[in-house]
Amino acid sequence: MENTENSVDSKSIKNLEPKIIHGSESMDSGISLDNSYKMDYPEMGLCIIINNKNFHKSTGMTSRSGTDVDAANLRETFRNLKYEVRNKNDLTREEIVELMRDVSKEDHSKRSSFVCVLLSHGEEGIIFGTNGPVDLKKITNFFRGDRCRSLTGKPKLFIIQACRGTELDCGIETDSGVDDDMACHKIPVEADFLYAYSTAPGYYSWRNSKDGSWFIQSLCAMLKQYADKLEFMHILTRVNRKVATEFESFSFDATFHAKKQIPCIVSMLTKELYFYH
């Protein structure tokens, strides 16, 4: 392992007000009850990459060296999967919200899925624009089934490379060694989302200044190797293992040296997801 120093994607913000999320009723939908998502629409879908590297001085946040490596790796990976990739750099929180709102209003009826990758500083439930924080829920809510009807019943993948707190994982040594007769045409508005977080709740997320973040490196490598062979959750399990076993932080600050990381997958997918068909 090359001893280039690792960084974290975190910025502590005090006195954030909690958001109250009101429930919503299900909506009518002609969803098929097959076990896997239909991925043979005319288009695979959009892949939006928001790559925030440089932040306003007023935020006190440092530049995220290595993030351009992640963005380039992601562009190549998802283009190879036939996604239409749109890369946006250094967006303010207002620009992030505006972009996500506009994308959600597009006609996705000929698209199989939707992918959004967020590369930035973060905290639990928060991603940072270049000038301040955005509630992740505010971003993802635009794509709920009752608000983005052309993506209803289709997989919506949010990949988030950012810290979720300030805890450090020191690691530990180990010894190796739906029924057909359910004619339901309503689905929950929060169904068919998947959130792939780079780290567990409350923890730092590591990024190498030369090679990019551990999580994005691993995600792209596993997609390139297995996207034509394995179901997506199986691929993400391999990503978890790669990050957990092959990476360890190197820092001249002893507090941040020899630390570990484990990604966290939160799935509300209702079917298996294969990128091939």
UniProtKB/Swiss-Prot annotation:
Give me the residues of the propeptide, which is removed upon maturation: 1-9, 10-28
Q: Which InterPro entries match?
A: Caspase-like_dom_sf, Caspase_cys_AS, Caspase_his_AS, Pept_C14, Pept_C14_caspase, Pept_C14_p10, Pept_C14_p20, Pept_C14A
Post-translational modification as stated in the protein's UniProt record: Cleavage by granzyme B, caspase-6, caspase-8 and caspase-10 generates the two active subunits. Additional processing of the propeptides is likely due to the autocatalytic activity of the activated protease. Active heterodimers between the small subunit of caspase-7 protease and the large subunit of caspase-3 also occur and vice versa. S-nitrosylated on its catalytic site cysteine in unstimulated human cell lines and denitrosylated upon activation of the Fas apoptotic pathway, associated with an increase in intracellular caspase activity. Fas therefore activates caspase-3 not only by inducing the cleavage of the caspase zymogen to its active subunits, but also by stimulating the denitrosylation of its active site thiol.
Protein's UniProt keywords contain Thylakoid: no
The residues annotated as the active site are H121, C163
Q: Give residues where N-acetylmethionine occurs.
A: M1
- Cellular-component GO terms for this entry: cytoplasm; cytosol; death-inducing signaling complex; glutamatergic synapse; neuronal cell body; nucleoplasm; nucleus; postsynaptic density
Does the keyword section mention Zinc-finger? Answer: no
Q: Name one GO biological process term.
A: protein catabolic process
Q: Which reaction does it catalyse?
A: Strict requirement for an Asp residue at positions P1 and P4. It has a preferred cleavage sequence of Asp-Xaa-Xaa-Asp-|- with a hydrophobic amino-acid residue at P2 and a hydrophilic amino-acid residue at P3, although Val or Ala are also accepted at this position
Q: Which residues carry this modification: N6-acetyllysine?
A: K11
Carrying (Microbial infection) ADP-riboxanated arginine, the residues are R207
Q: Which residues carry this modification: Phosphoserine?
A: S26
**Enzyme's top EC category:** hydrolase
Outcome of swapping D28A? In P3-D3A mutant; abolished cleavage and activation, leading to prevent thiol protease activity
Pfam families named in the record: Peptidase_C14 (PF00656)
Q: How does it assemble?
A: Heterotetramer that consists of two anti-parallel arranged heterodimers, each one formed by a 17 kDa (p17) and a 12 kDa (p12) subunit. Interacts with BIRC6/bruce.
Please report which protein family the annotation says this sequence is part of.
Belongs to the peptidase C14A family.
Protein's UniProt name: Caspase-3
Q: Which species does the entry assign this protein to? A: Homo sapiens (Human)
Gene that encodes the chain: CASP3
